[in-house]
């Protein structure tokens, strides 16, 4: 303000640029400049929608467009759904963005589809759950700004163009209109199609990694998943953001979310290796490192998870936990706990990981020191361990006989039960009590080791091993059921 008149304005972006001007100094890379915002590249992908999507998904998209026309709003499919459509990769996670009242649109679409609608009015978002369990996300077109680097965003309603502008990479800024008069029209404001063809990950503006440093982790994930590469300029900005300590300001739970997504990918080690190159792992915690044999360990985990998946057994394993146990497995307890404190996962996850790591380390020592591995011993060691820790152990152990013993436990031994039950022991005249547990466990171990096979074998085993708790007749023999009834009637 000068002389009572407004001469200009300083925006949030101006302040961030001034604060982080060193980070934003652009290296002189040829042909690496960013494209200017402009009108979208014209293209219609209705035929691609028809050829690539199941009829049911096409019907849902058509219904969304029809409802949009009825309530007077423009409706778009956006994000990874559109990106993967153009890449000819299957992705049925439908995300819709509405220019207007997204909640009102979601409720109207929910009525048409007989879907349950869960709304979050603060953010202008909703989740539609169809009767068969299929889900669609609906969001009001919005823009975001960040009060400070690495902060959570503040949200305001906006246009589809500004909604796409807030996204991480140009390949995720593509949108397809679903309204009847424009069905299949592809919006590409930021050159996302060209970047898909060039296999390049490009940020939309220079402050992208300042606003949200977790985008660096997503960049590595997308690089490996799609075989893409960060543009040289974007890579330099990512490394600058790491060196300036911006990741240290990110809430741990957000890092946990990104790490979980990474460990659920097909090639998690390659992503971690890329993050290590960018300095991200050390920025999260100095002890978060990749040992010389970690790649081989991750490869074995992948093989073990594939093997277990082919068994079609319940329960299923949380694969990312198995990889996390492997990543932390060689650390001391205090070190892994320190990293978990930085990541700050939900308490249930933190407790599980700490417990599983302790069990994994103890089991590894036991198996390494064991000279013999009878099935009963393996059962006693593993029966109380989580599935994830057992699979991590199987991948960790190199001795074939140990891996086979663990595999036998998972495939058959853990389901073994003795034939006799408590009522059978009672029929033998054994008084109910803690002794039942001892007897049944002994029977189980004997069956696991092949010492008993039939019901008669188990009866003989009990009479021989637990003779002291069996009632005896006056001749020193075991009492029959008739003898016990007679004695009871005499009493």
Q: PLM ranges: what are they?
A:
Residues 1-491:
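Catalytic cores of the polymerase beta-like nucleotidyltransferase superfamily
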């Amino acid at each position: 303000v000068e002389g009572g008149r407004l001469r200009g304005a300083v925006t949030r972006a101006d302040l961030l640029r001034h604060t982080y001007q060193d980070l934003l100094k652009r290296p002189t890379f040829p042909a690496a400049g960013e494209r200017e915002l402009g009108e979208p590249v014209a293209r219609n992908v209705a035929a691609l929608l028809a050829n690539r999507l199941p009829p049911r998904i096409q019907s849902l998209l058509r219904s969304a467009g029809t409802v949009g026309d009825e309530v007077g709003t423009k409706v778009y499919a956006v994000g990874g759904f559109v990106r993967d459509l153009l890449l000819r990769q299957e992705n049925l996670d439908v995300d819709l963005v509405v220019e207007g009242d997204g909640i009102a649109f979601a409720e109207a679409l929910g009525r048409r589809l007989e879907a349950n609608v869960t709304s979050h009015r603060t953010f202008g978002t909703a989740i539609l759950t169809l009767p068969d369990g299929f889900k669609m996300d609906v969001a009001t077109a919005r823009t975001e700004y960040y009060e400070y680097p690495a902060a959570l965003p503040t949200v305001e309603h906006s246009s589809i163009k500004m909604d796409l502008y807030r996204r991480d990479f140009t390949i995720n800024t593509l949108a397809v209109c679903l309204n009847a008069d424009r069905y299949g029209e592809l919006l590409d404001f930021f050159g996302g199609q060209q970047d898909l063809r060039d296999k390049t990950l490009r940020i939309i503006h220079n402050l992208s990694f300042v606003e949200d440093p977790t985008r660096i982790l997503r960049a590595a994930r997308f690089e490996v998943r799609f075989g893409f590469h960060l543009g040289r300029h974007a890579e330099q900005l990512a490394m600058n953001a790491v060196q300036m300590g911006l990741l240290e300001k990110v809430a741990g739970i957000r890092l946990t979310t990104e790490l979980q997504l990474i460990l659920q990918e097909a090639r998690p080690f390659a992503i971690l290796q890329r993050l290590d190159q960018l300095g991200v792992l050390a920025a999260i915690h100095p002890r978060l490192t990749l040992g010389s044999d970690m790649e081989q360990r991750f490869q074995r985990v992948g093989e073990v998870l594939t093997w277990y998946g082919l068994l079609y057994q319940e329960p299923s394993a949380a694969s990312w936990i198995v990889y996390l146990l492997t990543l932390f497995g060689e650390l001391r307890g205090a070190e892994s706990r320190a990293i978990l404190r930085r990541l700050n996962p939900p308490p249930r996850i933190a407790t599980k990981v700490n417990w599983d790591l302790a069990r994994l380390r103890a089991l590894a020592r036991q198996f390494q020191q064991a000279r013999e591995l009878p099935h009963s011993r393996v059962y006693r060691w593993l029966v109380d361990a989580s599935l994830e820790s057992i699979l991590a152990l199987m991948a960790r152990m190199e001795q074939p006989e140990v891996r086979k013993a663990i595999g036998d436990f998972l495939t058959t031994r853990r389901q073994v039960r003795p034939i006799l039950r408590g009522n059978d022991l009672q029929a033998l005249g054994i008084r109910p009590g803690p002794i039942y547990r001892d007897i049944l466990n002994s029977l189980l171990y004997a069956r696991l080791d092949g010492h008993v096979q039939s019901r008669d074998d188990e009866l003989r085993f009990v009479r021989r091993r637990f003779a002291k708790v069996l009632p005896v007749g006056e001749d020193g023999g075991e009492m029959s059921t008739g003898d016990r009834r007679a004695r009871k009637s005499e009493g």
